[in-house]
Regions:
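An edge-strand/N-cap motif at the start of beta-rich repeat modules
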Residues: 1-21
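Short glycine/acidic-enriched loop and turn motifs that connect beta-strands
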Residues: 8-11, 56-62, 111-114, 169-171, ...
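Beta-rich, blade/repeat-based domains predominating
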Residues: 11, 36-46, 89-104, 136-159, ...
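Short loop/turn segments immediately following beta-strands, especially the blade-tip
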Residues: 18-25, 71-78, 117-127, 175-183, ...
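A short beta-strand motif characteristic of beta-propeller blades
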Residues: 28-34, 81-86, 137-143, 185-191, ...
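Blade-loop segments of beta-propeller domains
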Residues: 29-102
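Blade-level signature of beta-propeller repeat domains, shared across WD40, Kelch, NHL, RCC1
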Residues: 315-355
Length: 355
């Protein structure tokens, strides 16, 4: 099953779920749950029984904050049932993740410039935030970087740290993370070139390397990751474009292939997926391909857990296209299949035990 988070212009829009034919790459609509506002970014519980979505809004009840919603997943059909909702403690939550134990949802608030963790009950319901950290400061490009903008949050391979890319600060902030209590505590940061605009972040399957995609400069930073100390040491900066940056261009998503040999990043405006080969000894990147996403504004994409297909989500053209992945080169090839989904923002895969 493939779940698609979206921006909602009407009450009828919401979270979509699709079936992916693993033989051909064909996508077919399976269901939709409407009624929630801007369930843009999604995360699936490690036990595969629950799904969580940010509600990317600025006002939740009496707070200047967004929200996070919890859903149960029907193990046979993949259908979602709303469970409950809690404040994200900051405005416009745009990214979330569950820790490895499934006890906590960690959320990044973009306009709020903050992060929070919300405990998860055994029945999948969310409890009020157990930890909240407000970022402060600014960076080079005003007004874009006049304030902090937490754009993503990831949990380290050892489940000991939370790593936050802040577009407004040009920093990747590291927090010690206690999964039992859901507490985050500051543990340092890595700076990037001023004006870069850190957006999304991905760890290598080996746990040795990490990758940051920068929205404003359309670059990738390669880091060595020290799980013992929670330290990031920069190795390389490489452009995501094969040409000079043009007006209206920006990056969006970054993901590492499950086999750890390739990395993918999306370029909005240029409307491509950049493919890179990963040096297995050093973690450094070398460019392989720039594949058109066949639509406009690839805000997100997903790689299926087997590593066979990539699904590109084109926000502005309202469509998703599937691409087969060459296991030897990492190159993408269109399957010829696509499907219309209004304003897609996030792609998440789930292999249902009941299927």
């Amino acid at each position: 099953m493939v779940y698609i988070g979206t921006y909602t212009r009407t009450e009828e829009q919401g979270i979509h779920w699709l079936k992916l034919d693993m033989g051909t790459g064909k996508l077919t609509a399976s269901g939709k749950l409407s009624g929630q506002k801007n369930p843009s970014f999604l995360a699936i519980h490690p036990n595969k029984k629950f799904l969580y979505a940010v509600n990317e809004i600025g006002n939740y009840k009496d707070e200047k904050a967004g929200a996070v919603s919890a859903y149960s997943i029907d193990q046979k059909t993949g259908a979602l049932t709303f469970l409950n909702q809690q404040s994200s403690k900051g405005g416009a939550p745009c990214h979330l993740v569950l820790d490895a134990t499934g006890r906590n949802v960690l959320v990044a608030n973009y306009t709020g410039g903050s992060v929070a963790s919300l405990p998860v009950s055994r029945k999948g319901r969310l409890r009020p935030a157990s930890s909240f950290i407000q970022h402060t400061g600014s960076s080079l490009l005003k007004p874009r970087q006049a304030a902090p903008h937490s754009h993503s949050i990831n949990v380290s391979p050892g489940n000991k740290f939370a790593v936050v890319a802040d577009l407004g600060l040009d920093r990747v902030l590291v927090y010690g993370f206690d999964s039992k209590g859901g507490k985050m505590t500051p543990a340092g940061f890595a700076k990037v070139t001023p004006g870069s605009g850190p957006r999304h972040f991905a760890f290598h399957p080996s746990g040795k390397f990490a990758y940051l995609i920068n929205e404003i400069t359309l670059t990738l930073n390669v880091f060595v990751w020290d799980e013992m100390r929670g330290k990031l040491n920069e190795l390389q900066t490489i452009a995501t474009l094969p040409v000079e940056r043009g007006k209206g261009m920006s990056t969006a998503e970054v993901q590492v292939h499950p086999n750890g040999r390739f990395l993918y990043g999306s370029n909005r405006g240029h409307d491509t997926i950049a493919v890179f080969r990963i040096d297995q000894k050093t973690g450094k990147l070398s460019a392989v391909q720039h594949q058109s996403t066949l639509g406009k504004t690839p805000r997100n994409f997903g790689i299926d857990p087997t590593g066979k297909y990539l699904i590109a989500a084109n926000q502005s053209s309202g469509d998703l296209f599937t691409f087969s992945i060459n296991r030897d080169s990492g190159e993408l090839k269109p399957t010829g299949y696509s499907i219309k989904v209004p304003m897609p923002v996030c792609v998440k895969f789930l292999d249902l035990p009941g299927k």
